[in-house]
Amino acid sequence: MAFLDFLRPKPAVKPLSFSEPIFIKENSSTKNQIEKLEKWKELIIPEQADRLTKDIKKLTSGLNGEKTVAYELKNSYLPILILQDLYLKNQDTTAQIDFVVIATSFILVIESKKLIDDIEVTNKGDFNRCFKTATGLVYKKEGMYNPVTQNQRHVDLLKRLLSEQMPALPVQDWDTLLQSVVVLANPKTVIQDANAPAEIRDKIIKHDQLINHLKKLQEANTGVLLSEQDMRAIADILVSAHQERPYTPPANYQFTVPLCPKCNVPMVRRTAKKGAKQGNEFFGCPNYPKCRQIINID
Protein backbone atom coordinates (compact mmCIF):
# COMPACT_ATOMS: atom_id res chain seq x y z
CA MET A 1 0.00 0.00 0.00
CA ALA A 2 2.81 2.40 0.89
CA PHE A 3 4.48 1.61 -2.47
CA LEU A 4 1.25 2.37 -4.32
CA ASP A 5 0.97 5.67 -2.42
CA PHE A 6 4.49 6.53 -3.52
CA LEU A 7 3.60 5.89 -7.17
CA ARG A 8 0.41 7.92 -7.00
CA PRO A 9 1.13 11.42 -8.35
CA LYS A 10 0.40 14.41 -6.19
CA PRO A 11 -2.18 16.94 -7.37
CA ALA A 12 -0.66 19.76 -9.40
CA VAL A 13 -0.28 22.99 -7.44
CA LYS A 14 0.97 26.33 -8.70
CA PRO A 15 4.49 27.08 -7.38
CA LEU A 16 4.61 29.21 -4.24
CA SER A 17 5.80 32.81 -4.37
CA PHE A 18 8.06 32.23 -1.34
CA SER A 19 10.68 29.62 -0.49
CA GLU A 20 11.42 30.27 3.19
CA PRO A 21 9.42 30.43 6.44
CA ILE A 22 7.13 33.42 6.98
CA PHE A 23 5.84 34.33 10.43
CA ILE A 24 2.29 35.62 9.94
CA LYS A 25 1.84 36.11 13.69
CA GLU A 26 4.93 36.29 15.87
CA ASN A 27 4.47 37.21 19.50
CA SER A 28 3.83 35.48 22.78
CA SER A 29 1.34 36.31 25.50
CA THR A 30 3.77 34.64 27.92
CA LYS A 31 6.11 37.62 27.57
CA ASN A 32 3.28 39.99 28.50
CA GLN A 33 2.40 37.81 31.49
CA ILE A 34 5.99 37.96 32.76
CA GLU A 35 6.08 41.74 32.36
CA LYS A 36 2.88 42.09 34.38
CA LEU A 37 4.14 39.82 37.15
CA GLU A 38 7.34 41.89 37.34
CA LYS A 39 5.21 45.02 37.84
CA TRP A 40 3.22 43.27 40.56
CA LYS A 41 6.31 42.54 42.68
CA GLU A 42 5.83 45.78 44.62
CA LEU A 43 2.06 45.31 44.89
CA ILE A 44 1.83 41.78 46.27
CA ILE A 45 1.84 41.10 50.00
CA PRO A 46 5.33 40.17 51.34
CA GLU A 47 4.23 36.65 52.32
CA GLN A 48 3.63 35.78 48.64
CA ALA A 49 6.81 37.29 47.19
CA ASP A 50 8.52 33.89 46.88
CA ARG A 51 5.51 32.41 45.13
CA LEU A 52 5.49 35.28 42.63
CA THR A 53 9.20 34.77 41.93
CA LYS A 54 8.61 31.06 41.27
CA ASP A 55 5.72 31.84 38.91
CA ILE A 56 7.93 34.27 36.97
CA LYS A 57 10.65 31.63 36.75
CA LYS A 58 8.17 29.04 35.47
CA LEU A 59 6.77 31.40 32.82
CA THR A 60 10.28 32.43 31.77
CA SER A 61 11.19 28.78 31.24
CA GLY A 62 8.10 28.32 29.07
CA LEU A 63 8.93 31.46 27.07
CA ASN A 64 12.46 30.19 26.45
CA GLY A 65 10.94 26.95 25.18
CA GLU A 66 8.76 28.87 22.73
CA LYS A 67 11.82 30.81 21.54
CA THR A 68 13.66 27.54 20.93
CA VAL A 69 10.83 26.19 18.78
CA ALA A 70 10.50 29.50 16.92
CA TYR A 71 14.23 29.41 16.17
CA GLU A 72 13.94 25.93 14.67
CA LEU A 73 10.99 26.98 12.52
CA LYS A 74 12.78 30.10 11.27
CA ASN A 75 15.80 28.04 10.31
CA SER A 76 13.91 25.23 8.59
CA TYR A 77 14.29 26.98 5.20
CA LEU A 78 10.94 25.49 4.19
CA PRO A 79 8.10 27.38 2.47
CA ILE A 80 5.76 27.47 5.45
CA LEU A 81 3.49 30.00 7.12
CA ILE A 82 3.77 30.19 10.92
CA LEU A 83 1.39 31.54 13.53
CA GLN A 84 2.49 31.76 17.16
CA ASP A 85 0.38 31.88 20.30
CA LEU A 86 -3.23 31.63 19.18
CA TYR A 87 -6.17 31.73 21.55
CA LEU A 88 -9.19 30.32 19.72
CA LYS A 89 -12.78 29.63 20.66
CA ASN A 90 -15.34 27.45 18.89
CA GLN A 91 -18.59 25.96 20.16
CA ASP A 92 -17.86 26.91 23.78
CA THR A 93 -14.44 25.23 23.53
CA THR A 94 -11.20 27.18 23.82
CA ALA A 95 -7.61 26.39 22.87
CA GLN A 96 -4.31 28.10 23.62
CA ILE A 97 -2.08 26.96 20.75
CA ASP A 98 1.67 27.56 20.79
CA PHE A 99 2.30 27.27 17.04
CA VAL A 100 0.41 26.47 13.85
CA VAL A 101 2.52 25.68 10.80
CA ILE A 102 0.79 25.78 7.40
CA ALA A 103 2.39 24.05 4.40
CA THR A 104 1.11 22.78 1.07
CA SER A 105 0.62 19.25 2.39
CA PHE A 106 -0.04 19.69 6.10
CA ILE A 107 -1.20 21.96 8.91
CA LEU A 108 0.84 21.18 12.01
CA VAL A 109 -0.29 22.11 15.52
CA ILE A 110 2.71 22.33 17.86
CA GLU A 111 2.62 22.14 21.64
CA SER A 112 5.91 23.40 23.09
CA LYS A 113 7.10 21.98 26.41
CA LYS A 114 10.12 23.15 28.42
CA LEU A 115 10.25 20.42 31.05
CA ILE A 116 12.97 20.31 33.69
CA ASP A 117 12.44 16.73 34.83
CA ASP A 118 12.62 13.50 32.85
CA ILE A 119 9.34 12.06 31.57
CA GLU A 120 8.08 8.50 31.58
CA VAL A 121 5.26 7.37 29.29
CA THR A 122 3.66 4.08 30.33
CA ASN A 123 2.22 1.37 28.09
CA LYS A 124 -1.21 2.87 28.82
CA GLY A 125 -0.13 6.29 27.60
CA ASP A 126 0.03 7.86 31.05
CA PHE A 127 2.66 10.55 31.64
CA ASN A 128 4.78 10.66 34.79
CA ARG A 129 7.33 13.28 35.83
CA CYS A 130 10.41 11.60 37.31
CA PHE A 131 12.25 13.28 40.18
CA LYS A 132 15.88 12.25 40.59
CA THR A 133 18.57 12.52 43.23
CA ALA A 134 21.91 14.17 42.49
CA THR A 135 23.24 10.72 41.53
CA GLY A 136 20.44 10.13 39.03
CA LEU A 137 18.23 7.76 41.03
CA VAL A 138 14.48 8.23 40.65
CA TYR A 139 13.01 8.80 44.10
CA LYS A 140 9.52 9.92 43.11
CA LYS A 141 7.14 9.82 40.16
CA GLU A 142 4.31 12.29 39.77
CA GLY A 143 1.51 12.03 37.24
CA MET A 144 0.99 14.88 34.79
CA TYR A 145 -1.58 15.66 32.15
CA ASN A 146 -1.08 14.10 28.73
CA PRO A 147 0.20 16.83 26.36
CA VAL A 148 -0.54 14.66 23.31
CA THR A 149 -4.21 14.39 24.28
CA GLN A 150 -4.32 18.11 25.03
CA ASN A 151 -2.86 18.94 21.63
CA GLN A 152 -5.32 16.63 19.89
CA ARG A 153 -8.14 18.68 21.41
CA HIS A 154 -6.54 21.73 19.81
CA VAL A 155 -6.54 19.90 16.46
CA ASP A 156 -10.22 18.99 16.86
CA LEU A 157 -11.14 22.62 17.55
CA LEU A 158 -9.08 23.76 14.57
CA LYS A 159 -10.83 21.25 12.31
CA ARG A 160 -14.27 22.48 13.35
CA LEU A 161 -13.29 26.12 12.92
CA LEU A 162 -11.66 25.70 9.51
CA SER A 163 -14.34 23.39 8.11
CA GLU A 164 -16.96 26.00 9.02
CA GLN A 165 -15.00 28.82 7.38
CA MET A 166 -13.88 26.82 4.32
CA PRO A 167 -16.77 24.40 3.61
CA ALA A 168 -15.57 23.73 0.05
CA LEU A 169 -12.80 21.51 1.43
CA PRO A 170 -14.19 18.07 2.43
CA VAL A 171 -13.97 17.07 6.09
CA GLN A 172 -11.80 14.06 5.21
CA ASP A 173 -9.24 16.44 3.72
CA TRP A 174 -8.99 18.30 7.02
CA ASP A 175 -8.42 14.95 8.72
CA THR A 176 -5.54 14.35 6.31
CA LEU A 177 -4.02 17.82 6.53
CA LEU A 178 -4.20 18.44 10.27
CA GLN A 179 -1.30 16.96 12.23
CA SER A 180 -0.06 17.43 15.79
CA VAL A 181 3.23 17.11 17.63
CA VAL A 182 4.58 17.86 21.09
CA VAL A 183 8.06 19.40 20.99
CA LEU A 184 10.31 19.06 24.04
CA ALA A 185 12.37 22.25 24.10
CA ASN A 186 14.78 21.30 26.90
CA PRO A 187 17.74 19.35 25.43
CA LYS A 188 18.42 17.80 28.86
CA THR A 189 14.98 16.23 29.20
CA VAL A 190 14.99 12.45 28.79
CA ILE A 191 11.74 10.84 27.72
CA GLN A 192 11.28 7.16 28.53
CA ASP A 193 8.74 6.06 25.94
CA ALA A 194 9.92 2.60 24.90
CA ASN A 195 6.70 1.05 26.23
CA ALA A 196 4.41 3.86 25.12
CA PRO A 197 1.69 3.22 22.51
CA ALA A 198 2.92 4.08 19.00
CA GLU A 199 0.25 6.74 18.55
CA ILE A 200 1.67 8.54 21.60
CA ARG A 201 5.36 7.92 20.93
CA ASP A 202 5.15 9.22 17.35
CA LYS A 203 3.67 12.52 18.55
CA ILE A 204 6.60 13.50 20.80
CA ILE A 205 9.93 14.82 19.50
CA LYS A 206 12.93 16.81 20.70
CA HIS A 207 13.34 20.35 19.38
CA ASP A 208 16.35 19.37 17.26
CA GLN A 209 14.16 16.81 15.45
CA LEU A 210 11.55 19.38 14.42
CA ILE A 211 13.02 20.32 11.04
CA ASN A 212 13.29 16.68 9.94
CA HIS A 213 9.74 16.13 11.17
CA LEU A 214 8.54 19.00 8.99
CA LYS A 215 10.40 17.64 5.98
CA LYS A 216 8.83 14.21 6.43
CA LEU A 217 5.37 15.74 6.56
CA GLN A 218 6.14 17.89 3.52
CA GLU A 219 7.34 14.91 1.48
CA ALA A 220 4.51 12.60 2.49
CA ASN A 221 2.18 11.78 -0.38
CA THR A 222 -1.21 12.46 1.19
CA GLY A 223 -3.06 13.19 -2.05
CA VAL A 224 -4.23 16.52 -0.60
CA LEU A 225 -2.35 19.73 -1.36
CA LEU A 226 -3.08 23.34 -0.52
CA SER A 227 -2.42 26.20 -2.89
CA GLU A 228 -0.71 29.36 -1.65
CA GLN A 229 -4.10 31.05 -1.76
CA ASP A 230 -5.49 28.30 0.50
CA MET A 231 -2.52 28.58 2.87
CA ARG A 232 -2.90 32.33 3.25
CA ALA A 233 -6.68 32.04 3.58
CA ILE A 234 -6.24 29.60 6.47
CA ALA A 235 -3.72 31.92 8.12
CA ASP A 236 -6.12 34.87 7.75
CA ILE A 237 -8.96 32.87 9.29
CA LEU A 238 -6.86 31.95 12.32
CA VAL A 239 -5.54 35.48 12.82
CA SER A 240 -9.10 36.84 12.65
CA ALA A 241 -10.36 34.18 15.06
CA HIS A 242 -7.58 34.86 17.58
CA GLN A 243 -8.77 36.56 20.76
CA GLU A 244 -6.58 38.64 23.03
CA ARG A 245 -6.97 37.67 26.66
CA PRO A 246 -6.26 40.10 29.50
CA TYR A 247 -3.94 38.43 31.99
CA THR A 248 -5.41 38.16 35.47
CA PRO A 249 -3.49 37.28 38.66
CA PRO A 250 -3.22 33.60 39.59
CA ALA A 251 -5.78 32.41 42.11
CA ASN A 252 -5.20 33.34 45.76
CA TYR A 253 -2.76 36.16 45.01
CA GLN A 254 -3.22 38.98 47.52
CA PHE A 255 -2.22 42.57 46.83
CA THR A 256 -1.70 45.72 48.87
CA VAL A 257 -3.99 47.56 46.43
CA PRO A 258 -7.55 46.71 45.32
CA LEU A 259 -8.28 44.68 42.19
CA CYS A 260 -10.23 46.20 39.31
CA PRO A 261 -13.85 45.01 39.69
CA LYS A 262 -14.05 44.44 35.93
CA CYS A 263 -10.58 43.24 34.87
CA ASN A 264 -9.49 41.56 38.13
CA VAL A 265 -6.00 43.11 37.99
CA PRO A 266 -4.19 45.27 40.59
CA MET A 267 -5.23 48.89 40.28
CA VAL A 268 -2.86 51.87 40.07
CA ARG A 269 -2.82 54.85 42.44
CA ARG A 270 -3.51 58.03 40.48
CA THR A 271 -4.32 61.71 41.12
CA ALA A 272 -7.22 63.54 39.48
CA LYS A 273 -5.82 66.30 37.25
CA LYS A 274 -9.04 68.22 36.63
CA GLY A 275 -12.68 68.52 37.61
CA ALA A 276 -14.31 68.87 40.99
CA LYS A 277 -12.02 66.22 42.48
CA GLN A 278 -8.78 67.71 41.12
CA GLY A 279 -5.88 66.75 43.39
CA ASN A 280 -7.74 63.84 44.98
CA GLU A 281 -6.11 60.40 44.83
CA PHE A 282 -7.91 57.34 43.52
CA PHE A 283 -7.22 53.82 42.25
CA GLY A 284 -7.66 53.40 38.50
CA CYS A 285 -7.56 50.37 36.23
CA PRO A 286 -4.20 49.89 34.45
CA ASN A 287 -6.14 49.00 31.30
CA TYR A 288 -7.40 52.59 30.92
CA PRO A 289 -8.82 53.84 28.54
CA LYS A 290 -10.31 50.44 27.63
CA CYS A 291 -11.49 50.15 31.22
CA ARG A 292 -12.50 53.23 33.25
CA GLN A 293 -13.16 51.57 36.60
CA ILE A 294 -12.03 53.65 39.60
CA ILE A 295 -12.07 53.36 43.38
CA ASN A 296 -11.89 56.60 45.31
CA ILE A 297 -9.45 56.90 48.19
CA ASP A 298 -11.09 58.52 51.22
Language-model segments: residues:
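Cell-envelope/extracellular polymer assembly enzymes that use nucleotide-activated donors
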Residues: D98
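Surface-exposed interaction regions that form or flank ligand-binding interfaces
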Residues: M1-A95, F106, K132-D298
